């Protein structure tokens, strides 16, 4: 079903809500108050340094730099900004050709303003491309500023890091995501129940982009946002099912817990999906603190083994066995 008449911009085309509701001003960006306040100072003073914006996906890195560039350059944005996704354009030729040619281009800008090169997913650039970029940043420092968005700043070579101001972003809180979702559902007239939005927040895990995409997908597919519809669309292990597994472990019902795990595994969920949901359920489960710490430790070790490639039903059952042993040990006098 079409999302809403307000979303349509052409026949049969629905604009993604993640683009439609992307903030155009730095002050409107949700969460990461410290990072946003630093960018607001840059927007006000107009003296933009080279920047590295580092943090998890969907936390506002690209949106922040786009909004900053719009505020700094105004009507000159189109001719004074070069946007590249470094995961596609990641080789040394891009730096030597596209970026260098843009840096050499003459653009008339107000005093104190510079051209801006935005490199998204810069941590996927090859080492050779980063070395070439370092030299380009140096040579054209009078006319061009560079903004690099990445998930982990450690993958950016030291010479580039030393030439940039580092702005760190963190995952958004549940309340911050909820606030934005309520704005969108009101604007798009989306019928929902509170449990549906809670499910979207759970599946997003601090990622605003994921939250908006899940909201739009659920509304497009079912025209109503409730818990059941959200988990059908997002195709993640249902947290209530996983919660039952944890409860059965705590109640020393190991066989029933294994049966519940087998059901999830047979539905086609990967061990990574199951253990990630399990970890988040344990983290928020009401149990003794020392027990929760031990459960999280064992889950972390199992996750590490699965990430190393040993992803099997046997590993997951082994984890439940260890959690049961931890529980029995805690009960012993």
UniProtKB/Swiss-Prot annotation:
Q: Which PANTHER family match?
A: REPLICATION FACTOR C / DNA POLYMERASE III GAMMA-TAU SUBUNIT, REPLICATION FACTOR C SUBUNIT 2
Q: How does it assemble?
A: Heterotetramer of subunits RFC2, RFC3, RFC4 and RFC5 that can form a complex with RFC1.
Spell out the SUPFAM superfamilies in the cross-references. Answer: P-loop containing nucleoside triphosphate hydrolases, post-AAA+ oligomerization domain-like
Q: Name one GO molecular function term.
A: DNA binding
Q: Name one GO biological process term.
A: DNA replication
Compartments annotated for it: namely:
Nucleus
Give the residues the record marks as binding ATP. 55-62
The name this protein carries in UniProt is Replication factor C subunit 2
Sites of the modification N-acetylalanine?
Answer: 2
What does the protein in this record do? Answer: May be involved in DNA replication and thus regulate cell proliferation.
Swiss-Prot/TrEMBL keywords = Acetylation, ATP-binding, DNA replication, DNA-binding, Nucleotide-binding, Nucleus
Q: What is the organism of origin for this protein?
A: Arabidopsis thaliana (Mouse-ear cress)
Question: Which residues does UniProt call coiled coil?
Answer: none
- Superkingdom assignment: Eukaryota
Annotated disulfide bonds: none
One GO cellular component from the entry? nucleus
Name the family. Answer: Belongs to the activator 1 small subunits family.
